[in-house]
Amino acid sequence: MNHIEKWLKSTPTFDCGNKSIEEKAKDITKGYEEASDKARSLFYFVRDEIKFIPHLPVGVLESYQASKILKARGGMCIQKAILLATLARAVGIPALVHFVDIRNHRVPTKIKEVLGTNLFPYHGYNELYIDGKWVKAAPTFELKVCQDNRLIPVEFDGKHDALLPSHDLGGNPHIEYLQDHGRYENIPLDKIHDAWTQAYGLEARRGLNQFIEVRKAKSRHLRR
């Protein structure tokens, strides 16, 4: 197996051989022949149809399994990146998750208060191998989140890098890229959770997850 082919294989998290993943990937890319067009269509599906939920899953493998993320229709940056990489692999595009620490200067005040910081270790974005080169893409925030918060949405054409922007629509600082952790063939759960514990502490992580669950419950109640 060469250095490109290994980013096509199915793993416990990148379960691209799962029936639901295969069917969804084929449905999204139906009618497209070029890898860049397929990648673009998959990107926008994950960006906008998979809701960004800023929770911090404790080390349960299923929380990071692409087929489970697809079924849940929501997840944090790492989970959305896992799903995009897996859908891409399902249609023959080598893809991976790249990890980096970021500082989000536009993080909601309540979340910053709970965590005690705007630092987010091990943010995950994608790299996809298209037309002989690796292209970066971050499907983190859906369009509605960007519109509601005056953020610049990430737009991806399947050919050029598309990462989270440094400033928002008002010119205020948004994302600051810090330490690069690189690529991993398997999701480094131990390193991720150690970094989260060091940055936030266990109580803050539990507090954030409880806060998100309350918000989700309120949202379900309003939809009734």
Where are these regions (language model features)?
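Short capping/connector residues at structural and topological boundaries
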Residues: 19, 57, 74-75, 159-161, ...
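His-Asp-centered catalytic microenvironments across diverse enzyme cores
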Residues: 2-3, 9-13, 102-224
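A sequence-composition feature that detects small, non-aromatic residues
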Residues: 25, 35, 39, 66, ...
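Active-site neighborhood of thiol-dependent amide/isopeptide-bond enzymes
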Residues: 54-122
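Residue-level signal for well-ordered alpha-helical scaffold segments within enzymatic catalytic domains
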Residues: 44-48, 86, 90, 124, ...
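Secondary-structure boundary elements
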Residues: 2-72
